[in-house]
């Protein structure tokens, strides 16, 4: 019998990422875990619908036995079984992030006995989670270099707080993992601005694009009007394609916040990324830790190692026989496997 790993949900940033990473790693390694103080660092601690859906999805895919899988629970015991490929559908029942549920279960399906398709309904444009286009255009091309073949499709948008969106991913078992080397971003090839609107006047998008164009030379400017029943909602994105990597940044519009202020938030975030020679943005760094650990080799550079990143590394090191090195030089941190 494999040893039970005990995790403190309050460590580091104290959010849901500790639970999601633990679920992924438990499914992959077969190691059971207990976590207490789930989301202790949040204003509303314990399992929300999104986290509960991730737990139930993980349990279904690997036939796990679970204790504490209920809304508001701050303690969970997870004993995994064998991961099995298949066609899975999960509903969050709120505007909780579809992509964060997918993020939890897809790594385990890299080790399944056959190809899989996972469909999740809930929120797709959430201010605290990556949109499907980030997964599709930024993360999945990098995963392909590592040896992971998966394809995400956004079937229907669902903005916060209404939800109602649908995202699906097709994924195949990984034959072998490759080392990812992302030391330098390289020169910028082009930048693309994009605005999504659902039940929001078009002039909002035009003002947001104008704000982006006032700060950056945009090779593309796209406005997409979605059906009103997928809103109301508004998301502004800016994609930076460089020689070695494509990064994508986004901001979700808010009621009573002007189009110019929303877009200015995005401008500030992109300028912060471009001010550093680091290849990887803050959020993408979190996403690369697990596949890099599974490969057992690789490195990337990031401007600032967030608390989120360091917490994720700590969880990975509890489950896998790897050690990460974080070395800061001239304002850039190089993250690698020792």
Curated annotation (Swiss-Prot):
Record localization: Cytoplasm
Q: Which UniProt keywords apply?
A: ATP-binding, Cytoplasm, Ligase, Nucleotide-binding
What Gene Ontology cellular-component terms does the record carry?
Answer: cytoplasm
What GO molecular function terms would the record report?
ATP binding; RNA-3'-phosphate cyclase activity
Active site feature: 308 (tele-amp-histidine intermediate)
Q: Which reaction does it catalyse?
A: a 3'-end 3'-phospho-ribonucleotide-RNA + ATP = a 3'-end 2',3'-cyclophospho-ribonucleotide-RNA + AMP + diphosphate
Q: What is its EC number?
A: 6.5.1.4
Annotated membrane-spanning segments are: none
Annotated S-S bridges: none
- State the Gene Ontology BP annotations: RNA processing
Name the major location: cytoplasm
Annotated residues that bind ATP are located at 103, 283-287
The UniProt entry, under InterPro entries, shows:
RNA3'-term_phos_cycl_insert, RNA3'_phos_cyclase_dom, RNA3'_phos_cyclase_dom_sf, RNA3'_term_phos_cyc, RNA3'_term_phos_cyc_type_1, RNA3'_term_phos_cycl-like_CS, RNA3'P_cycl/enolpyr_Trfase_a/b, RPTC_insert
One Pfam short name: RTC
> What is the role of this chain?
Catalyzes the conversion of 3'-phosphate to a 2',3'-cyclic phosphodiester at the end of RNA. The mechanism of action of the enzyme occurs in 3 steps: (A) adenylation of the enzyme by ATP; (B) transfer of adenylate to an RNA-N3'P to produce RNA-N3'PP5'A; (C) and attack of the adjacent 2'-hydroxyl on the 3'-phosphorus in the diester linkage to produce the cyclic end product. The biological role of this enzyme is unknown but it is likely to function in some aspects of cellular RNA processing.
What is stated as this protein's family in its record? Belongs to the RNA 3'-terminal cyclase family. Type 1 subfamily.
By what name is this protein known?
Answer: RNA 3'-terminal phosphate cyclase
Q: Species name for this entry?
A: Escherichia coli O81 (strain ED1a)
